[in-house]
Structures are given as C-alpha cells and as structure tokens.
C-alpha cells in the first residue's frame, strides 16, 4: 500500500477535446491542467512507478485531494506501459466536489463531464465526481477490497449513506476489478 496525498494517475482533460476541454480551462501544447497533482511531476511519478514495477505482487495507491471517487490503473510511460498498480481515490467528506467546481462549466453537466474524463483517460475504470463520502478498505495478505460509501447530504446531520461501488485488487495482479474479491 502506498499513500499519496494527491492523485497519481495522469488526468488528461486536454484530450477531452472540443468545448468540454475549453470550458474546463484546458490549454494546448500538452501543458498539464492539474499541475498540483502528480501530473505536475511526471519524471518523479515515472521513477516511483518504475520502482513499483520492479516489486512483485503489484501495489495499491490510496490518494485524495480531487474531492471525488476514482479507480484508476497506473502504468509506466505516462499510462502507456505495463500496469504496475491500482489507485483508489477517496471522495471529499464535506468540501465542494470536483463536479461542483467543473460540471457547471460543461454543457450537459456531471454526466458529460464524467464521460469526457473516461474517454480521455482509458486508465480510469470508474469515477463519481459529485458525491461526498468515504472509502472503507478491507485488507488481507491476498487482496484489498475498497467500498465507496456516499452520502446525499452534507451540512445536515444524518446517518443515511449508500454503497456506491466496490472495487478490488488481488496480490500479483495490479489491475483493479469491479466487485468484491473472493476470499
């Protein structure tokens, strides 16, 4: 397990293209949009992923700071190389979400934003840009299972929550898969 305060997976919004990319503030020439994440440190990310690639058994990176829920596949060569780790990104508990910040700038809102993210980032297996919540991990020697629990309201006391997704990764295979791992 590797903990990272910020998201390690490359996030390409430039490739989202057209009006979506422009409305999100994308710039041309390959400049990164999200330079406060690992995207701003591509050489360092490549070195770390290279180290993870040399360790047998795969790895799982836990990250945050995007205020949304993501499951990504990490690979060397800016995502074009062999898979070396999965990444589980936790949502915000109460801070404004990724969708709240960006979806109003996109015609069609959240659903168009999430489709554009997935289209431009094939290494992103799942994303929910709008929900608040938390991630609950179940870790054994053979697998890690993550359950994203989301809440519909913040700012008002309630114990209502819902299971939004379950993703897992098993020892020896760095690719995340949808659903619980077999014990």
Model-derived features: positions:
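Long, structured stretches of catalytic cores involved in phosphate-ester chemistry, encompassing
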Residues: 1-183
